[in-house]
Amino acid sequence: MQNMLMGRYIPGDSIIHRMDPRSKLLVMIAFVVIIFLAHDWLGYLLLVLYTLAGVLLSKISVSYFLRGLRPMIGLILFTVIFQMLFTNGQHVIFSLWFIKISTESLINAVYIFFRFVLIIFMSTILTLTTPPLTLADGIEKGLGPLKKIKVPVHELGLMLSISLRFIPTLMDDTTMIMNAQKARGMDFGEGNLLKKIKSVIPILIPLFVSSFRRADDLAVAMESRGYQGGDGRTKYRQLKWQSRDSLLVVSIIIMTILLILWSKVS
């Protein structure tokens, strides 16, 4: 559970930390889209350099990014191997029964690997440099135009902020419950698949009870303080779009233009 970084924030004073969450969200969404424009080594090299620039500017240790990558290793390897084994290509370099590995399948597998890693790194930058409540405020502000069609933007923002706030708490509760069960002699690593599934039950039941208790306490606290959502509420911290946020958006626009031009030229 220590590898789960969602909802965790690393305090800092880097330029990435000081940016408006709306600009970081916009760049993150754009990055996920334009990564599919890259189809050769030069395109991925540009994306790698862009990501490395974000990592360096965030002034956060690379170990945090590697920790964020660990929970996804299984999915990444499965996808890469599947792509490598079942993608048809003209230049076959290995063949066994129905399995054929070609140069094209190897290249595609490497590209998919880079896509996963780069997206995870960029999302990790967003998570580690933006407090969860600030991130929720940014999403709420970004969804502001939807108020015109009666979408409850404030309520959605509140739900998101509460969810993000309690992710680290749930992770800590899970770790505490697992340690308590291990102290009672529970072994989560032995047995077949069915036994491993059954061993999760002693974790899930206390975790659900704890979660419902926390939710009830939060609801009572909000009611006792007279909380009322909707328009008219002000925020303690106001989001301010500054020149550095505009530069960040311009950088992703330039990256998009470069990838589009290169895809047409090549």
Curated annotation (Swiss-Prot):
Coiled coil: none annotated. It comes from the Bacteria. The chain crosses the membrane at residues 29-49, 73-93, 106-126, 151-171, 246-266. GO terms for cellular component: plasma membrane. Keywords: Cell membrane, Membrane, Transmembrane, Transmembrane helix, Transport. It is found in: Cell membrane. Pfam families: CbiQ. GO terms for molecular function: ATPase-coupled transmembrane transporter activity. It is a multi-pass membrane protein. Part of a common energy-coupling factor (ECF) ABC-transporter complex. Unlike classic ABC transporters this ECF transporter provides the energy necessary to transport a number of different substrates. In this organism these probably include biotin, thiamine precursor, niacin, pantothenic acid, queuosine precursor, riboflavin and thiamine. Uptake of niacin or riboflavin into proteosomes containing EcfA1A2T and Niax or RibU has been demonstrated. Uptake requires hydrolyzable Mg-ATP and is substrate-specific; NiaX-containing proteosomes did not transport riboflavin. Forms a stable energy-coupling factor (ECF) transporter complex possibly composed of 2 membrane-embedded substrate-binding proteins (S component), 2 ATP-binding proteins (A component) and 2 transmembrane proteins (T component). In L.lactis forms a stable complex with EcfA' and EcfT and S components. In E.coli forms a stable complex with EcfA, EcfA' and individually with 3 tested S components (BioY, NiaX and ThiT) with a stoichiometry of 1:1:1:1. The core ECF complex interacts with a number of substrate-specific binding components, including BioY, BioY2, HmpT, NiaX, PanT, QueT, RibU and ThiT. HAMAP family: EcfT. Belongs to the energy-coupling factor EcfT family. This is Energy-coupling factor transporter transmembrane protein EcfT. The gene is ecfT.
